[in-house]
């Protein structure tokens, strides 16, 4: 079952996710840390919750006003169209005081070798100048794609650390590695 898979994955990922984080991210002050993520299938939510258990801080799911289709193929088409049009879906999620965070763990699935457009909306909606961004990515084999480049373009005055990249395949436990940054 999906719950059993996530429970087993959580045990596997717990140490992996924390140990794979850059040292600077491991020591982030919990009261100055935000874990923000977008998920479609729930995989990224699972990773975000594990990180939250390890580093503390505030945990926030970035939800678009208009959700993506629950049908996989329809979602893929919609995500591709959003990428091609550089869409910025409106988010119903609001961060009350973004200025209080120094470190932002940013989680998302790799969609079409980049960030999902709700992540672009989030990055454009707030000032990330001087903040440390720690990306964590769930994927089915595409690793980080061009997502770090996309984040760097949207947040040129931020420090972007190495990324945690976790692969999910149907019916298997996630496996992870560090990104190229």
Go through each PLM region and give its residues.
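Hydrophobic h-region of N-terminal signal peptides that target proteins for export
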Residues: 14-19
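Boundary at the C-terminal end of the N-terminal hydrophobic targeting segment
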Residues: 22-27
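N-terminal secretory signal peptides and thylakoid transit peptides that target proteins
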Residues: 1-13
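FMN-binding flavodoxin-like domain, especially the glycine-rich phosphate-binding loop
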Residues: 28-70, 77-78, 83-181
